[in-house]
């Protein structure tokens, strides 16, 4: 992941790939 996306959108310690609308529900499986 790109650093600027990583620090901008980090929810519960899980990076949301810079897409706040997805939050961590989609990426929680990763």
From Swiss-Prot:
- What keywords would UniProt list here? Hemolymph clotting, Lipid-binding, Secreted
Say if the entry is tagged with keyword Secreted. Answer: yes
Q: What is its main location?
A: secreted
Role played: Clotting protein.
User: Subunit comment for this entry?
Assistant: Homodimer.
Q: Which organism is it from?
A: Panulirus interruptus (California spiny lobster)
Tissue note: Secreted into the hemolymph.
Subcellular localization(s) per the UniProt record? Secreted, Extracellular space
Q: What is this protein called?
A: Fibrinogen
| An annotated Gene Ontology molecular function | lipid binding
The domain of life is Eukaryota
Q: Alphabetically, which GO biological process terms does the record hold?
A: hemolymph coagulation
Cellular component, GO, one term:
extracellular region
